[in-house]
A protein has these predicted regions:
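Structural transition elements
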Residues: 294, 328-362, 379-387
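A structural "hinge/loop" feature
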Residues: 35-52, 75, 102-106, 168-180, ...
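Surface-exposed binding/hinge segments that line
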Residues: 91, 114, 123-187
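Ligand-site clamp/hinge motif
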Residues: 194-200, 225-271, 389, 402
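Detector for C-terminal structural segments
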Residues: 28-33, 215-218, 224, 312-341, ...
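A bilobed periplasmic-binding-protein/Venus flytrap-type ligand-binding module shared by bacterial periplasmic
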Residues: 223-226, 285-308, 312, 503
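N-terminal lobe/hinge region of extracytoplasmic solute-binding protein
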Residues: 32-84, 120, 127, 202-208
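Aromatic- and charge-enriched surface segment that lines or borders ligand/interaction sites
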Residues: 78-128, 160, 252, 299-301
Length: 533
């Protein structure tokens, strides 16, 4: 088997036309990921695919301790917070090297100027660095753009963030890959050469691996960064083999074509767990699958129609079929694993008769047509979106609602939804930082309902925003939970979604994979992973 896996690594290297492995004994780990990321630029990343793809290349000021959502130092060795909660001052690690590539060789180590650059280029307003970027959906939605007032260099090793208001989630936000620290020198070099797009397509970071090659829909190849500040990774080469279907990922895992397979189909969990060559990795996840209803499109701008859609869908049957033994119904816009999920809340019950009555009351007669978008491949929050879409269409058809099922390659799927171009859409979210605000504000706030935002239902309620906004500014958990419960009640009243399921995260691994720790956030970190015999 060892010979087979080494041969695979060499074969992939040949296919991708990258540099040859430096020895026959080089350690190559192949990760069967779920699809091609929409970008390799951290600040443009929206999906978990993109965040996983940029994670090997970049570091953040702070990070999450393995297997948890606890914030620990990374590029920053420490920080202080002012008594009013508005000023965060970070002390930066010394002698952190940036990677080199065929088009760039850094002349200095990371310093405060790089931190300021990494955030200022995303803030609203003029500035030379703005030409290097595009749409920063994560930053410019309800996240940091509305929170950060300024980022200031105090000296080479100190940076101060000044916030417009206190924010309980600020440190956790900084741990997300979208807030990675990038090279000012590299950005300006590409700008001067007239190739600013390379800053995004050929990324340079301080992370444990450097990008070697990206073949869309085939594979992404990384090589160990010898000068990483934590020390050289144990792996020589890391390959993301793009494998959209769960069945194909399982086949590759069993045959030894990959060492780790993402998002195992729940139906295959038992087979993996009983195979002596494999290991099933499972963890409760901060995951949420839902059906978003575009509240700006007629007749779905009528709350009675949205409630009817909720009541016409047999959620229990669908979730049992799609997540056998690995998913549970959710009643709110929060995963079950979230401490702020209101355990007293209940979603609309399945009641086709009442759904029909509501539609008639709203003046909707038979013959209503609408589009239903679904992701092109499996996700941990929805293992079989196409099947779910068909089951939803089957539930709505007796009410005279005819759905046209649509999909798109993953790199354009989310951008399509964020444009507001869908009527109904199956979507999902994996928590990026463990804070309830990650779901309640990111997916449902008025700020995120703007064009290009992550509130694809385009629902906006000032009362909801006020509750969630207040909860985001305080740190006392009991008070926050009460505010979030009241916001969840408003969500239920307006019915902009059909909440579907919260899933356990399931990955498969070869038995010789060492030090691989799953995250409740669904991310994959190979910086400490090794391969045994």
């Amino acid at each position: 088997m060892t010979r087979l896996l080494r041969a695979l690594g060499l074969a992939l290297a040949t296919v991708m036309a990258g540099p040859a492995l430096h020895s026959a004994a080089a350690k190559t780990l192949v990760f069967c990921s779920q699809g091609s990321p929409e970008t390799l630029s951290p600040d443009a990343a929206v999906s978990s695919l993109a965040m996983d793809a940029v994670r090997p290349v970049f570091d953040t000021l702070v990070t999450f301790a393995p297997g948890t959502t606890d914030v620990v130092p990374s590029l920053a060795t420490g920080w202080t917070i002012s008594p009013d909660g508005l000023d965060y001052t970070f002390t930066l690690r010394e002698d952190v090297a940036f990677q080199t590539s065929a088009i760039f060789a850094p002349t200095r180590s990371m310093n405060a100027e790089d931190v300021v650059f990494s955030f200022e280029r995303q803030l609203p307003g003029p500035g030379a660095a703005k030409t290097l970027g595009g749409v920063y959906a994560q930053f410019r939605g309800p996240r940091l753009a509305s929170l950060v007032e300024s980022v200031t260099k105090l000296d080479e090793r100190s940076v101060r963030f000044r916030l417009k208001r206190p924010a309980a989630r600020f440190l956790a936000d900084l741990a997300m890959p979208v807030n990675a620290i990038q090279s000012l020198e590299y950005g300006y070099r590409m700008q001067q050469q007239g190739t600013p797009e390379r800053f995004d397509t050929q990324p340079i970071g301080t992370g444990p691996f450097r990008l070697v090659d990206d073949r869309r829909d085939v594979a992404i190849r990384y090589q160990a960064f010898e000068d990483h500040w934590r020390g050289r990774p144990k792996l020589d080469t890391l390959v993301y083999s793009i494998t959209p279907t769960a069945s194909a990922r399982l086949h590759k895992l069993k045959s030894g074509e990959c060492h780790v397979a993402a998002a195992v189909d729940p139906a295959d969990a038992a087979a993996i767990a009983t195979d002596p060559q494999l290991r099933l990795r499972a963890i409760p996840g901060l995951t949420l699958g839902y059906l978003a209803i575009n509240t700006r499109r007629k007749p779905f701008d009528d709350v009675r129609v949205r409630r009817a859609i909720n009541m016409a869908i047999d959620r229990e049957t669908i979730v049992s079929a799609i997540y056998p033994g690995a998913g549970s119904l959710v009643e709110t816009p929060l995963p079950l694993a979230s401490w702020a999920s209101d355990d007293q809340a209940r979603a609309y019950p399945y009641d086709a008769k009442e759904a029909r009555r509501l539609l008639l009351q709203a003046g909707v007669t038979a013959g209503l047509k609408a589009d239903l978008w679904f992701p092109p491949d499996s996700r941990s929050y929805n293992p079989d979106a196409k099947r779910m879409a068909r089951m939803i269409a089957s539930d709505l058809e007796p009410l005279g609602i005819k759905l046209e099922l649509k999909s798109a390659p993953w790199e354009s799927y989310w951008s399509q939804l964020m444009k507001g171009d869908s009527t109904l859409a199956l979507a999902g979210w994996i928590g990026d930082n463990g804070d309830p605000d990650e779901f309640m504000e990111t997916l449902l706030s008025c700020a995120a309902a703007k064009d290009g935002g992550t509130n694809i239902a385009r629902w906006c309620d000032a009362r909801y925003d006020a509750l969630v906004g207040e909860a985001s500014r305080i740190t006392e958990r009991e008070t926050r939970a009460d505010l979030y419960a009241r916001a969840q009640a408003l969500f239920h009243e307006a019915a902009p979604w059909v909440p579907m399921a919260s899933a356990r995260l399931l990955d498969g691994a070869r038995a010789n994979v060492e030090n691989f720790v799953m995250s409740p956030l669904g991310s994959h970190d190979f910086s400490a992973v090794d391969l045994g015999d």
